Amino acid sequence: MDTNAKTIFFMAMCFIYLSFPNISHAHSEVDDETPFTYEQKTEKGPEGWGKINPHWKVCNTGRYQSPIDLTNERVSLIHDQAWTRQYKPAPAVITNRGHDIMVSWKGDAGKMTIRKTDFNLVQCHWHSPSEHTVNGTRYDLELHMVHTSARGRTAVIGVLYKLGEPNEFLTKLLNGIKAVGNKEINLGMIDPREIRFQTRKFYRYIGSLTVPPCTEGVIWTVVKRVNTISMEQITALRQAVDDGFETNSRPVQDSKGRSVWFYDPNV
């Protein structure tokens, strides 16, 4: 398939997922007091999520589940960037959802736009280690920036991290992470632009939420550049969640032949 055909195919896929409610994000991620675990080969572990609750059936039966391995063998190169981001500071709170730590914006924190559809930034949270892998490599942390459209669609940006220098955005949140406990803490104005990607290269594919109910139809954008995070910051996130969720990454799912697009404006 040549470049123009790939671009047309991707646009068609996006149109399908942006236009029809029955494929859209119908259910939010579970909140606190979650009855699932990340312990593999257990009754409530990832392999059994679809059996815990009938509304979670797609966790086991879906064809577009996330995360996946972003392997070079599956990637198609696309030159059309097909998105813009316009973020701004807004009031935010930090919450321990039991299985992860979430920062949610209570005001207008801006948006990203994919194929003329606006997705408003709602919240971000972290998974340790990373959920997506790149050519089989799993990194130390993954940030998810969750966006929703006026029609209830979901688009998520994934940012990968490896051990190294402290992450500036997390440094500003560290006191809140350490103090959150079981209560919601006001963070004041938080600027999502401080989640710096430092690249215009990214992967994109159609997938799902990575926690129950595993709803499909999510547009995933995974940033190519791997940022750095300190061990202190990872430890703070792991100590803040409930016992048993110190590592909170869903195993890589079968891609089932899905296409993955890679955007590189320099090629």
Swiss-Prot record:
<keyword id="KW-0150">Chloroplast</keyword>
<feature type="glycosylation site" description="N-linked (GlcNAc...) asparagine">
    <location>
        <position position="135"/>
    </location>
</feature>
<feature type="glycosylation site" description="N-linked (GlcNAc...) asparagine">
    <location>
        <position position="22"/>
    </location>
</feature>
<protein>
    <recommendedName>
        <fullName>Alpha carbonic anhydrase 4</fullName>
        <ecNumber>4.2.1.1</ecNumber>
    </recommendedName>
</protein>
<feature type="binding site">
    <location>
        <begin position="210"/>
        <end position="211"/>
    </location>
    <ligand>
        <name>substrate</name>
    </ligand>
</feature>
<keyword id="KW-0934">Plastid</keyword>
<keyword id="KW-0479">Metal-binding</keyword>
<feature type="binding site">
    <location>
        <position position="144"/>
    </location>
    <ligand>
        <name>Zn(2+)</name>
    </ligand>
</feature>
<dbReference type="InterPro" id="IPR001148">
    <property type="entry name" value="CA_dom"/>
</dbReference>
<feature type="signal peptide">
    <location>
        <begin position="1"/>
        <end position="26"/>
    </location>
</feature>
<dbReference type="InterPro" id="IPR018338">
    <property type="entry name" value="Carbonic_anhydrase_a-class_CS"/>
</dbReference>
<dbReference type="InterPro" id="IPR036398">
    <property type="entry name" value="CA_dom_sf"/>
</dbReference>
<dbReference type="GO" id="GO:0008270">
    <property type="term" value="F:zinc ion binding"/>
</dbReference>
<feature type="active site" description="Proton acceptor">
    <location>
        <position position="99"/>
    </location>
</feature>
<dbReference type="InterPro" id="IPR023561">
    <property type="entry name" value="Carbonic_anhydrase_a-class"/>
</dbReference>
<feature type="binding site">
    <location>
        <position position="127"/>
    </location>
    <ligand>
        <name>Zn(2+)</name>
    </ligand>
</feature>
<keyword id="KW-0325">Glycoprotein</keyword>
<dbReference type="GO" id="GO:0009570">
    <property type="term" value="C:chloroplast stroma"/>
</dbReference>
<dbReference type="GO" id="GO:0004089">
    <property type="term" value="F:carbonate dehydratase activity"/>
</dbReference>
<comment type="function">
    <text>Reversible hydration of carbon dioxide.</text>
</comment>
<dbReference type="GO" id="GO:0009535">
    <property type="term" value="C:chloroplast thylakoid membrane"/>
</dbReference>
<feature type="domain" description="Alpha-carbonic anhydrase">
    <location>
        <begin position="34"/>
        <end position="264"/>
    </location>
</feature>
<feature type="disulfide bond">
    <location>
        <begin position="59"/>
        <end position="214"/>
    </location>
</feature>
<keyword id="KW-0732">Signal</keyword>
<dbReference type="Pfam" id="PF00194">
    <property type="entry name" value="Carb_anhydrase"/>
</dbReference>
<keyword id="KW-1015">Disulfide bond</keyword>
<keyword id="KW-0456">Lyase</keyword>
<comment type="similarity">
    <text>Belongs to the alpha-class carbonic anhydrase family.</text>
</comment>
<feature type="binding site">
    <location>
        <position position="125"/>
    </location>
    <ligand>
        <name>Zn(2+)</name>
    </ligand>
</feature>
<dbReference type="InterPro" id="IPR041891">
    <property type="entry name" value="Alpha_CA_prokaryot-like"/>
</dbReference>
<keyword id="KW-0862">Zinc</keyword>
